[in-house]
Amino acid sequence: MAVAASIAVEERSVQARMASPSRFGDKAFEWLTLAMALAVVVLIILIGWQLWIGSSVAIKRFGFRFLVTSTWDPVAEQFGALPFIYGTLVSSLIALLIAVPLSIATAAYLTELAPLWIRQPLVSLIEMLAAIPSVILGLWGIFVMIPWLRDYPFPWLKRLFGWTPFFSGPIYGPSMLAGGIIIAVMILPIITSVSREILRSVPDLQREAAYGLGATRWEATRIAVLSYAKKGLFGAVILGLGRALGETMAVTMVIGNTPQIAASLFKPGYTLASVLANEFTEATTDMYLQALFEIGLVLFGITILVNLLAQLLLRTIATTSATRAVQ
């Protein structure tokens, strides 16, 4: 009884201390962090509101047609965003198809296979690649990457896959494929770095259990490590996609900046971010400026939608994994 009474007295003492004025600092910190979190939400809302206000006249005039028409004629004040939406999505998809396998493979090698003497230099090089300004990568793309692609890989791709609409037609230097490749170079270090940290966080118990069952290193990496970390890896891919959708300078310098919808990846294209960078200073009429604001609103909406879909998919994956674990 004496022990129980002592415990009860101690619990009341702890509760009293937590409710005392000395805990004002904790409450202040809680409210401060809450205010910072809400400030982020308010900032996003204000950005969307400003884009909506800036494009309200264009929205009323063109309506839904703005998203599904391909005419972009500032002189006649006829505007449609479809070529830019198409160019943004296709170039981002190309970038993901190239960067995701390379990034995850690199992260797995650095985490599971690379000896210590080579691991740190490779990590440093990847971090340096992420620090290169996009305009520098754009210059490299113009003077090094595009001539090389035009002379070697593009003709090879046309010989092998020219029977498909994706690699048919004449070969241009600046093109959708070149834009996708330069974006892949830019998002590769981001996805690699995040994926590496995710794989490093996998418990050693996962690996030891796989080895205990007789798995090889490759089998342990594939079954125990990559499978365990798939939710986090998907998040890393979405982070790279967010960067790909908004990339501006480098892709503007290599994609060709032609508002068209073409199946061939050898043809020039245009992205939402590129048209904003190229034409915002040239908008000499109110409607032209309104249309560019609506382009910004579309890009903003696509980015928000992609992130919301990613969160939904992550929750679905987590729910499925939990259900399988229970079964």
Describe the role of every protein-language-model region.
Residues 13-27, 31-32, 51-95, 115-116, ...:
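Periplasmic/extracellular loop-to-transmembrane helix junction in inner-membrane transport proteins
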